[in-house]
Amino acid sequence: MAYPGYGGAFGNFSGQIPGMQMQMGQPMPGAGPNMFSGGYPGYLGYSDSYSPADDSMWTYFTAVAGQDGEVDAEELQRCLTQSGISGTYAPFSLETCRIMIAMLDRDYTGKMGFNEFKELWAALNAWKQNFMTIDQDQSGTVEHHELSQAIALMGYRLSPQTLAAIVRRYSKNGRIFFDDYVACCVKLRALTDFFRRRDHLQQGIVNFMYEDFLQGTMTI
């Protein structure tokens, strides 16, 4: 069954982008070898045969990462800024980089390894393409109704009240900047993942212990 509120494909983007068509199970162009949609919609997996040493991004990642082979939020911010993935948009804020790490921090180290970085990179590229598609005037911002459209294109089926609350949270004077848009995408994905892991019957209903709720939401 389709999961309530969530039906996105890889990278949380199910809308068609001009010149880019994806189906579940297909590798993402330019995202590295053996990279497929896996687990459930919105997440990417790596085959066991994938060797990071074969990827050109491995050298770049290790130049930024610490001796433990991982990056913290400040290192991730520097890495993404130097990579130019934001394009003409403002670089990602430190807070957005923190929640990016939290989204993929499955071992709760507060850091991001190379495979997690690659997964993030794929999601960011998809979200950026989505943003560029709806930012037709190339102003670097989208309007509130365009954010609602983007959320729907990602596969989320949300009530008008929920959409309005999200727009109020991430808009500034009725406009949503790229950094805030990505922060919104990250939180939607992370919180949906947190909820779905506990929704064993896939009915959109979960009972939380108080501390479990805090651990899942305060870290994002």
UniProtKB/Swiss-Prot annotation:
GO cellular component, one term: plasma membrane
Binding-site residues for Ca(2+) 1, renumbered to this chain: D105, D107, T109, K111, E116
Membrane topology per record: Peripheral membrane protein
Intracellular or extracellular location(s): Cytoplasm; Cytoplasmic granule membrane
Outcome of gene disruption: No visible phenotype. Not essential for normal resistance to microbial infections. Grancalcin-deficient neutrophils exhibit decreased adhesion to fibronectin, and a strongly reduced number of focal adhesion complexes.
An example molecular function term from Gene Ontology annotations: protein heterodimerization activity
Domain EF-hand: 51-86, 92-127, 122-157, 158-193
Coiled-coil segments: none
SUPFAM superfamilies: EF-hand (SSF47473)
Pfam families according to UniProt: EF-hand_8
Keywords: Calcium, Cytoplasm, Membrane, Metal-binding, Repeat
Residue numbers binding Ca(2+) 2: D135, D137, S139, T141, E146
PANTHER family found in the cross-reference section: CALPAIN, SMALL SUBUNIT 1 A-RELATED (PTHR46735), GRANCALCIN (PTHR46735:SF5)
Task of the protein: Calcium-binding protein that may play a role in the adhesion of neutrophils to fibronectin. May play a role in the formation of focal adhesions.
Subunit structure: Homodimer. Interacts with SRI and LCP1.
Other noteworthy facts: This protein has been shown to bind calcium with high affinity.
Protein name in the entry: Grancalcin
Organism: Mus musculus
Phylogenetic placement of the source organism: Eukaryota, Metazoa, Chordata, Craniata, Vertebrata
Gene this protein is translated from: Gca
